[in-house]
């Protein structure tokens, strides 16, 4: 299983199995705080979506992925993740913005669908299963 380590404000966060299937986001303690599933073949695209860790903190996670079948791309450009600054969680339900777009090719874009997420409810962070809907071009989490 491949692992890619990134940092957020100096804190390491690991992303496992990012070549396809389930993507596990882990904190520095090795605890999985978000799981995402890639459906179909990942194209050369960029994703930007919101994740919440087990402490109820929210982050934007940006992903640039490219399948190995694309020839001529540097190896380091394949499956590159980075995390930007934490944002204020002002909504009870967590949104995933559909802000991915084609960078190099005109292929059909395949989004990453969440399998689990963490949601704060009355000060308690709960693990919720996959129940999402699209509203105004954004993913919305349903209630836990």
Which residues does each predicted region cover?
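Intrinsically disordered, low-complexity segments enriched in small/polar residues
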Residues: 1-144
């Amino acid at each position: 299983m491949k692992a890619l380590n990134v940092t957020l404000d100096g804190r390491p966060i690991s992303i496992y199995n990012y070549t396809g299937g389930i993507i596990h986001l882990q904190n520095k303690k090795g605890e999985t705080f978000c799981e995402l599933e890639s459906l179909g073949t990942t194209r050369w695209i960029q994703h930007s979506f919101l994740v919440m860790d087990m402490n109820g903190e929210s982050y934007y996670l940006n992903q640039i992925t490219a399948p190995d079948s694309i020839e001529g791309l540097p190896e380091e450009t394949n499956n590159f993740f980075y995390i930007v600054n934490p944002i204020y969680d002002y909504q009870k339900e967590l949104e995933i913005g559909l802000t991915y777009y084609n960078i190099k090719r005109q292929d059909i874009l395949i989004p990453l669908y969440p399998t689990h997420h963490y949601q704060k409810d009355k000060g308690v962070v709960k693990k919720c299963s996959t129940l999402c809907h699209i509203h105004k071009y954004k993913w919305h989490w349903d209630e836990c």
